[in-house]
Amino acid sequence: MSSARAVAVRSRLPEALAWLAFVALLVVPALAWPRGWMLGYLAQTAAMIVLALSYNLLLGTTGLLSFGHAAFAGLGAFVAAHSFNRYGLPLPLVPLAGGAAGAAFGALFGFVATRRAGTAFAMITLGIGELVAAAAWSVPEWFGGAGGVSIDRAAGPALAGWEFGKPMHAYALIAAWCVVAAVAMRVLVRTRLARLANAVRDNPARVAALGTDPCRVRFAMAIAAAFFAGVAGALTLIDVEVATAESVGMLRSGAVLFATVIGGTTAFFGPVVGAVLLTFFSVFVASVSRAWLLYLGLLFVAVVLAAPGGASGRWRAWRDARRHGGARFDARRALPGAGAALAGGVAIVFAAELAYALQFAQNDARRAVIGPWRFDAGAPLGWGIAALAAALGVGLAHAARRWGRGAPRTNGPAFADAIDTCGAACGSAELKARDAGDVDGSTNAASAANETNAVSIASTTSTTSMTSMTSTTSTTSARHAARVSDNAPSPVFEVAAEPVGGGVHAASAPPALRMADVSKSFGATPVLVGIDLTIRPGERHALIGPNGAGKSTLFNLIAGALAPTRGRIALNGIELGRRRPHAVARLGLARSFQQTSVFARMSVYDNLRCAALHAPRARRRWRRGPAAAAAIDRAADAALASIGLAAHRDALAGSLSYAQQRALDVGLALASGASVFLFDEPTAGMSREQARRTIELIRRATAGKTVLMIEHDMDAVFGFADRVSVLVRGELVATGSPAAIRANAAVRAAYLGEAF
C-alpha cells in the first residue's frame, strides 16, 4: 500500500509543481514590485490566462477552431459593466455576471454553430464575431459608442475594508478570480463531459455510434467556454474600468488563438504559457519595437511548423522520450541547431527594425534602435550584419541537419503488436478520412460511393467478373470470387433454414433485427433492393457477398447513418424510422467500422472508458459519483483484458498497429453493453491466426447476444455463424445455415467458388 501511495504521489507531483508555479507567477511579482505598471501588466496577464484556458476548452478539448471567441468576453464585459452601474452589483461578483452573460450568448450562438464542426464551425464563428463587432458600433445605447461603457470600481461597496479603487486591491481580486477560474476549468476537463468532448474531437462518428449526440457535447462545451470567456472579459473590465468595442473585435479573437497555439493545446497549462508570452510581447516588446506584431506572427508560424503541439507539447514529447530512454543529448546536433536559431533571430531583428525605420522615418531620421546600438537604415552596416547572420544561420542549420542524420530519433517508445505481428501491408490502411461536421449522413460516404459505383458498372456491363475480396483481407478469401453474368436476373436460392440459439424465449420475443422491403438508392442508382431479413435474439448471423454488393450500406441503414429510400427496419421490436445514429445506439445497437475507428489522441484505456460510459447501466447511474465511476473502470478493465491490449493500457490509440486498432475497434463495441452487434469485416487486414483469435474473442464476448457480421473470410464465417445471408448486386439471394449455404451449388457458382 505504501509503495502504491508513493507512486500516486510521484504521479501528482508535476501537476502540483505546475500549480505552485502558476500561483507564484501571479503573487510574487506583485509583492516584489507593487507598482502600478507591474500590477497592470499582471492583471492583463491574468485576464488573458483565463481567456486562453477557456478557448482551449473549444480548441484542445473539443477540437473546435473558433474565430469569434472574444465576442463572448466582450459581451460579458458589457453586461458586467451595466450590472455594476445600474444595479449596484458588488465588484467581487462582477466576473460572475460576466460569466453568466457569456454563457447565455454562448448558448444562443452555439445552438447554431455547434451543429457543424471543422471548417464550417470556424466560418460560422467568424461570421458571429463580425456580427457582434458590427453591432458594437451600431447600438451605441448599449455598447457606448466610441467611448465604450466605463465604471468606477471605487464607487462600489467596500469588502472587509478593501476599497477596490486601489490598484493592489483590484489586482488581488483579479488574481483570485483567475485562480478560481483555472481550478474550475481543471475540474471540468476531468469530468465525463470533457472525456466525451475529447472523443468527439477525435472521432464524432464513433461517438454517435456509441450513443451520444456529438452536437450536444459541442454545445455543452461551447457554453462552458463562453462562460469562462465572459469571466475573462469582466476581469479586463475591472482592470481598465471600461468596456469598449475593441474588446469584441477580431484582433482579440486572433490574440487568444495565438496564445493557445503557441502555448500548446495538449497540456492544461499550455495556454497559460502562451498567454504569458503574448502579454509579454504586447507590453514589453511593443514598448521597444514597432515590429512586435511581426515578431509575434513569426513566432506563431515557427511554432506551427516546428512544434505543432506548442511549447508544452514539445516539452511533454521530450519528457516522454526521456522517460523511455529515447532522448539523449547530442551536442553535434543541438549546438549547431541552437546557433542557427540565434543567428536567424538576429537576422530577422536587424532586417525588421531597419525596414521599419525606413518605412516610418520622420524628418529624415532613419535611425533603428537595436539594443544599445543605433543604426542608420540607409547605411550598409546594419543590412550587412543581417545578411551575415542569415548566412551563418543557414550554414549552422545545414550542419545540424547533416550531423544529426545518424543520431537516434526521439519519437518515444515503439509498441509491439497486441494480437500478433501485423504485416507491412496492414500499416498503410490505418487512418480514416471523415468529415466531422456531418456524422449522421456521411459516416461511411466513401464506402457507399464505392458500392454505388460497383452497382452502376455491373448494370451496364454484359459480362464481368465478380470483384475479388479486398486486398487487406486474408489470403483465404481470395479464392472465393466467381464470375456471374450480369445479363441474367439475380438468382434467388431457396436454402433450408435451421433453428438457431435462443430457445423458447427467443421464439416468443420480438426479432432482434427485422428488415422489411428495405431499399436504398443514390440518385437514380439502386444499391439495395427489397431486403427482407429477420434475425432472432441470440443469433450469430453472417452477411457475405462480393465487394460493391451493398453490405456496408445495409449496415449504415441499420445504424442510422443513412436513411432507407423505402422499407422499414426494427430493432428489438422498435421501429427505427429516421432515428439518428446516437438514438439507434441507445436502443441497444453497437457497431464496428469497416476501417479502424478509434479515438486516436486518447489512451487505449480512455477509449474503453468512453465506450463503457454508454452501457445502459452506466447511463442510468452516471450521476451517482464514485460508485458509478468504479463500475465504469471495471467494465473498461474487463474489455481491455479481453482484447489483449492490457500491456498498452496508457498508449495513445493512434500509436497502435493496424491489428491492435482493429482489436480496439471491436473492444469499443463490446464495452458499450449493447444487445445487438454489427461487425463490419472485423478481421480485415489480419493474418489467419489474428483472424482466428478475433473471431474467438467476438464469439466469447457476445455469448447470448445478437451478432450481424460482414466478413470475407469464409472459414471464419462458416465457423462462427448460425445462419448466413448472401448479398449480390444489392439483392438478398440466399439465407440459410452455413452447411446449407456451402452445399448449394448455385451459391458456390455465384460467389463462393467450387473450392467450397
Describe each model-derived feature in a short phrase.
Residues 559:
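Helix-to-loop junction immediately C-terminal to a conserved catalytic motif
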Residues 677-681:
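Catalytic Walker B motif of ABC-type/P-loop ATPase nucleotide-binding domains
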Residues 567-575, 586-587:
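Conserved ABC transporter NBD signature motif
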Residues 2-420, 491:
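Transmembrane alpha-helices and adjacent helix-loop boundaries
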Residues 717-719:
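A short, surface-exposed alpha-helical micro-motif characterized by mixed small hydrophobic
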Residues 544-546:
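The feature captures the beta-strand-to-loop junction immediately N-terminal to the Walker
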Residues 513, 528-530:
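Conserved structural motif at the start of ABC-family nucleotide-binding domains
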